[in-house]
Amino acid sequence: MYEGKHIHFSEVDNKPLCSYSPKLCKQRRLNGYAFCIRHVLEDKTAPFKQCEYVAKYNSQRCTNPIPKSEDRRYCNSHLQVLGFIPKKERKKKNDPIDEVKVRHQMDTMAFSLTVPTLALKMPNGLDGMSLSPPGARVPLHYLETELEDPFAFNEEDDDLKKGATVRKKLQSKLAQNRQRQRETEILKVRQEHFSPPPAPSQQQPPQQHSHLSPLSTSLKPPAPPQGSVCKSPQPQNTSLPMQGVAPTTHTIAQARQLSHKRPLPLLPSSRAPTVDPPRTDRILMKATAFSPHFSCISRLQRLVKLCTQKHQLDTDLFPHLGLDWSEESGEEPEDSEQASPYQVAWSIRETLRYQRHASDDDDAESRSSRVTQLCTYFQQKYKHLCRLERAESRQKKCRHTFRKALLQAASKEPECTGQLIQELRRAACSRTSISRTKLREVEPAACSGTVKGEQCANKALPFTRHCFQHILLNHSQQLFSSCTAKFADGQQCSVPVFDITHQTPLCEEHAKKMDNFLRGDNSRKVQHQQQRKPRKKTKPPALTKKHKKKRRRGPRRPQKPIPPAVPQGNLSMPASVSLPVEASHIRSPSTPELSADELPDDIANEITDIPHDLELNQEDFSDVLPRLPDDLQDFDFFEGKNGDLLPTTEEAEELERALQAVTSLECLSTIGVLAQSDGVPVQELSDRGIGVFSTGTGASGIQSLSREVNTDLGELLNGRIVHDNFSSLELDENLLRSATLSNPPTPLAGQIQGQFSAPANVGLTSATLISQSALGERAFPGQFHGLHDGSHASQRPHPAQLLSKADDLITSRQQYSSDHSHSSPHGSHYDSEHVPSPYSDHITSPHTTSYSGDNMAATFSAEMPIMAQHLLPTQLEVPLGGVVNPRTHWGNLPVNLGDPSPFSNLLGADGHLLSTSLSTPPTTSNSETTQPAFATVTPSSSSVLPGLPQTSFSGMGPSAELMASTSPKQQLPQFSAAFGHQLSSHSGIPKDLQPSHSSIAPPTGFTVTGATATSTNNASSPFPSPN
């Protein structure tokens, strides 16, 4: 069995319901299928087909199912619309159309009877009535039985009320027969009724007293001029217009009747003013039986009473004749029975119009049914017009009768008539005064409230004695209430408010404030979020600085970048031993005189109370910022409470790229020395894409590299990377893994640009060879197959020669450093020579001058890139003489060369061993120039650097000249917590890269060099460890 998507069950008996897929259907399923009869077409196996009717207004096909066994194309509803089957009609209770059918034995076209047919062809014998008005020609049985006034309180006889639905037609026939007999009797005695004797009488049963009292409720109650009909002694006597009064139909009479019981065949009293001889419940009274005084006064009084009743009835229950029509009343059969004929006619006409529009395009619509509907409408309309005509004629005759009765009473009993007229006028005046009083109450009066002891001049609200401002003084009113808002001082707002929809009504002023407040919440949130970005310019404390989440960029070094064609002067940097700076003119915020422990108490308390993981908003600075010291240069924003750095990921990436770029430049400068020492021709290295940078002894020193090295390096040098980002960068001594490095302070050659308030100095150092012991053999593995010779042992210079070359190199570099420091004024830019990119495959040297007498040139194969071997002694110790309380970080830093991991990632992608030196300026001015020297080293072992040829290292002797510099005590905050995951692989970076906060700057020119020798396939022979 196929099922839809919605599988659900009944909450009553837990039986499965229709599983219609598009929407949830709660109908019962058909037996054997998972759908109801409405949605069974979703199951293609069901024996049903779809209706073929297509709507014209939306071109959608009908979705009703049709059994396949039936030979038809449309469902039942559209068969009716198309006119193939008759439409179902709701059978109304005591439908007058059915009575017409029974009475006249008409077929379905009986509704097309025209007005002449209804007036002249009726079989009830009324065709020849000449004295009755035109309205009397309407079929009485049709107008009198069902289409009556809704306020007539008509009730059928007991036999009709108790009759069942099956006996309705039979009862209707019996009632019609009785009415025909009555009409025949009326025609027989019509001449006697209009005879001169003033003794006409009217049949009036006792149960019709209340029915006849308001019968003559017209504009003027009629009164018989000659006599009256009196009832038997039990009921009160009433009089009705008799002679000379044109009869009116019983339908209009029932509009005023209040009785609960009346015989159905009873003729209208105005139509039947004659005496019915067989009746014994009525007494015929002649005018001579009473005195003239009694008859005239009593008749007039009765007319006055009827007039009063008529006025009350019209005042209270005036919506007769269709004026109380309601659309809802036509929907239910019970209400439709009480509707007036014209209401029914109007509703039928509207229905007919709607059906005309709906079926204009329907050619199969039955013409007979449309003709029938149209005739029904005209018939109802004709009946309504007849009622209006009868009512108007009756009003005229009633006024005439009243005038006659008043004239007769005044002529015979003037005093009594005068008193009666006075009473009528008094009653009319009282009614007029009451209406005027009501009008006065509606008129606005002055407010009864007082303002500062004076009467309020405003007009009062309708039906009140107070204006809008003082309406709350009226405690009985329920519409107005006081504003529920309060002012800032706690005073309750007393403005009246007309608000019946809210629990807490607000006056106009407070309502606007509330709306603005609610709207401002969202706008303020948006504004705060937009203002957070500009606020970053004002360097908030590190605790409140949010780490910016940004997609990490990959390595920015392309495979083959194109060097810039135009020299960039601002990006140049000399490849000298160090870059000095005049510390007397530049004060670095990275060496603050105010430490974390020396903070004011209030700031320290604030920092202690704020947790690290709490995100602060801008509003939280209102209490913290006023407490900060005035001199913010002494306050390090990048240092936390415990000295922990809180840098961002961007800072780490910029630092890493800068270090790699600086190391590449240093390696390039080192290549020049090694190439000259190993005897490789300069031209060959240039052809292989390796620039040789050399400087003779008589030259000014190693020439500075002036081409654009890297975008990040240029930004670092020119201040586009804010120097404060690196003001607190200090490496943990644990990163070097139990190694000792001693860095004596050296003078800083050159000057930093003026835009660096206190930047980190970048020193590009070349190889410095200082050694007093024999230089061991250095061999490259056999893959260096492009060397000049397999062994070249004879061409290899003596170690003593290497030492002499190293001494000359040191002397030349120091000379260059001193010269360059004097040539560059304070705040000047670097030299703008073009520096080739370290990432380029082809690097040419702007200076091809080689050292005089240098035989240290090396030849390398094109397949193997040049790798600068950094000579890192196992233990380098240089005492910091004269330093007050020297820290271990700068005094003794052990470097264990047995562990190759610290240097594993010092190789760049192009094969160069990366080495950098960053230094911060010292706090004191140093005028002396000292040589960087290494301490005596006792190498315990030598290890093979990963990715490098096996190399033997030799220790170097210390220099005799050391400079002692005094400086305040340093505090090195931990850097590994922030940069450990990124710089752990770069732990081979010398300690001079660690910027200091408040002590002597690390040596600017700490140099490590790589000494290479040519060998074909010899492995490294480690040095013996001297004890």
UniProtKB/Swiss-Prot annotation:
Keywords: DNA damage, DNA recombination, DNA repair, Isopeptide bond, Nucleus, Phosphoprotein, Transcription, Transcription regulation, Ubl conjugation. It comes from the Eukaryota. InterPro entries: Potential_DNA-bd (IPR025927). Residues 201-216, 914-932, 1001-1027 have a biased composition (Low complexity). The modification Phosphoserine is found at residue 132. It holds the Pfam family zf-C3Hc3H. Residues 229-257, 937-954 have a biased composition (Polar residues). It is found in: Nucleus. Residues 525-559 have a biased composition (Basic residues). One of its GO terms (biological process) is positive regulation of DNA repair. There is a cross-link at residue 87 (Glycyl lysine isopeptide (Lys-Gly) (interchain with G-Cter in SUMO2)). Residues 193-278, 519-574, 813-850, 914-969, 982-1027 are annotated as: Disordered. Putative regulatory component of the chromatin remodeling INO80 complex which is involved in transcriptional regulation, DNA replication and probably DNA repair. Component of the chromatin remodeling INO80 complex; specifically part of a complex module associated with the N-terminus of INO80. Belongs to the INO80D family. This is INO80 complex subunit D. It comes from Homo sapiens.
